[in-house]
């Protein structure tokens, strides 16, 4: 009986480790070869004067995730207790942004979709109230090949792409200040209620150009429900279809071929 109890304890411990050790964050974004610093949650919260970056700032939460049950709270907007980045990067409408994830590699068991949204700040993003942001989807890639469980997913492509993801800013978006919301949803535990892991990350952008499109968006806490078919799902079966969570991408959205980005310079985030 002691052996059985020990085995049960070890299984519980391993399950806990699996659920708590797989975490991640975006260290930097790259625009036309220029790298802009994000927010480093393992070190920046402890610095009396952390560098200005373009990534939204959070306490050190063990690089953890947002649960589906928290999808109706402001934790889902840009992660738990997130506050606006103190700087922004400038990008032209139509340009691509490479988003670099840490740790390298992203856990290969954490299969799931990769999603990208924009929300206009209607003013300075550095001082925006996150609850006022309304997001529209510019990219959403989910299951690529489900013939052999657990399947080949967007995050698997991200791993093969240098642990990063390429997204294009729609060419006809109206210029202005925007928050880019980028997210991986890990589905390895999603067969159980509240088992999916959501990793939202946000960045301040100044988009330039002559576009006129102003797509309608929705507040972050209205993007998902814990029982959405793309969030509550058993991926350890043959899947012929997968419904990517969230709203439909806007008509101007462009899915780009994934490729890594060569960094040629370090950019200085622009403060207010």
Swiss-Prot record:
UniProt gene name: LPMO9G
Gene3D superfamilies associated with the record: 2.70.50.70
Location within or outside the cell: Secreted
Signal peptide: 1-22
Entry-listed glycosylation sites: 60
The keyword Glycoprotein is annotated on this UniProt entry: yes
Family: Belongs to the polysaccharide monooxygenase AA9 family.
Phenotype upon loss of function: Results in about 25% reduction in fungal growth on sugarcane straw but not on Avicel. Results in moderate reduction in activity using phosphoric acid-swollen cellulose (PASC) as the substrate.
Top EC class for this record: oxidoreductase
UniProt source species: Emericella nidulans (strain FGSC A4 / ATCC 38163 / CBS 112.46 / NRRL 194 / M139) (Aspergillus nidulans)
UniProt-recorded name of the protein: AA9 family lytic polysaccharide monooxygenase G
A GO MF term: monooxygenase activity
Gene Ontology cellular-component terms listed: extracellular region
Induction: Expression is induced on lignocellulosic substrates such as sugarcane straw (SCS) or steam-exploded sugarcane bagasse (SCB).
Chain residues that bind O2: 188, 197
CDD domains, per the entry: LPMO_AA9
């Amino acid at each position: 009986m002691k052996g059985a109890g020990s085995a049960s304890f070890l299984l519980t411990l391993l399950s806990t480790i699996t659920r708590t050790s797989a975490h991640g964050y975006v260290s930097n974004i790259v625009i036309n070869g220029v790298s802009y610093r994000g927010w480093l949650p393992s070190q920046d919260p402890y610095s009396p004067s952390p560098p200005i970056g373009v990534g939204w700032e959070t306490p050190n939460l063990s690089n953890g995730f947002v649960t589906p049950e928290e999808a109706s709270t402001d934790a889902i907007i840009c992660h738990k207790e997130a506050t606006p980045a103190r700087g922004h990067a400038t990008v032209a409408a139509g340009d691509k942004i490479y988003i670099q994830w840490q740790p390298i590699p992203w856990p290969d068991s954490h299969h799931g979709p990769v999603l990208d949204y924009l929300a206009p700040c209607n003013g300075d993003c550095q001082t925006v109230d996150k609850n006022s942001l309304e997001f529209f989807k510019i990219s959403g890639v989910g299951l690529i090949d489900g013939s052999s469980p657990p399947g080949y997913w967007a995050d698997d492509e991200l791993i093969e792409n240098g642990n990063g993801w390429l997204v294009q800013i729609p060419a006809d978006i109206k210029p202005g200040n925007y928050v880019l919301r980028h997210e991986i949803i890990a589905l390895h535990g999603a067969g159980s209620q509240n088992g999916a892991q959501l990793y939202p990350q946000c960045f301040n952008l100044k988009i330039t150009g002559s576009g006129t499109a102003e797509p309608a968006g929705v507040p972050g806490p209205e993007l998902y429900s814990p029982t959405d078919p793309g969030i509550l799902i058993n991926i350890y079966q043959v899947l012929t279809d997968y419904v990517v969570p969230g709203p439909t991408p806007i008509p101007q959205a462009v899915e780009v071929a994934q490729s890594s980005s060569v960094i040629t310079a370090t950019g200085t985030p622009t403060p207010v």
